[in-house]
C-alpha cells in the first residue's frame, strides 16, 4: 500500500555489500594558507589512490596511484604554494578484492 515500507530488515549479507574500508577526515586547517594535512584511517589492507583536484576535476597532486597500503592511520601534507587560491578536492579511491571500488572526496579551500 501507499506509504508502507518495502523492506522489513537488512540481512547480514546485505550489510557486507559495502565494506567499511576507511575513514577520510576533513583536512586541517581548512581554509588553509600554503600547507594543509590530509588524514585517513584505513581499516583493512587496500589498494589506494589519493589525489587532489581543482574545481574542474583536473588532478593537481597525486600522493599515490593504486598502491597497496596496510591498515593504519596515514597523514599527507599538501603544499599548495604553487597553485592558485580557490576550492580543491582531495579524493581517495580504495579497492579491496571482491568488492567494487569505493570513492570518497572532501572539499578544501586554499586562501593566500
Predicted segment positions?
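C-terminal tail/sorting-segment detector
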Residues: 12, 81-112
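Solvent-exposed serine/threonine-rich low-complexity stretches and specific carbohydrate-binding patches
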Residues: 60-69
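Short, glycine-anchored, charge-dense loop/turn motifs used at functional sites
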Residues: 27, 52-60, 88
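Surface beta-loop-beta hairpin patches that serve as ligand-binding interfaces in beta-rich domains
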Residues: 1-6
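Glycine-centered coil/turn sites that cap beta-strands in beta-rich domains
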Residues: 9-28, 32-52, 75-78, 93-99
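A glycine-anchored, Pro-Gly-centered beta-turn/N-cap motif
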Residues: 70-74, 84-87
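Residue-level recognition of secondary-structure-to-loop junctions
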Residues: 42, 68, 80-83
Amino acid at each position: 500500500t501507499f506509504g508502507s515500507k518495502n523492506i522489513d530488515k537488512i540481512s547480514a549479507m546485505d550489510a557486507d555489500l559495502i565494506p567499511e574500508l576507511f575513514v577520510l577526515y576533513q583536512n586541517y586547517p581548512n581554509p588553509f594558507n600554503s600547507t594543509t594535512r590530509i588524514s585517513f584511517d584505513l581499516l583493512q589492507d587496500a589498494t589506494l589512490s589519493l589525489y587532489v583536484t581543482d574545481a574542474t576535476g583536473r588532478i593537481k597532486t597525486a600522493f599515490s596511484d593504486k598502491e597497496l597500503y596496510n591498515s593504519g592511520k596515514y597523514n599527507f601534507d599538501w603544499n599548495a604554494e604553487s597553485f592558485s587560491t580557490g576550492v580543491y578536492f582531495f579524493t581517495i579511491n580504495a579497492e579491496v578484492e571482491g568488492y567494487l571500488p569505493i570513492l570518497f572526496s572532501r572539499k578544501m579551500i586554499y586562501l593566500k
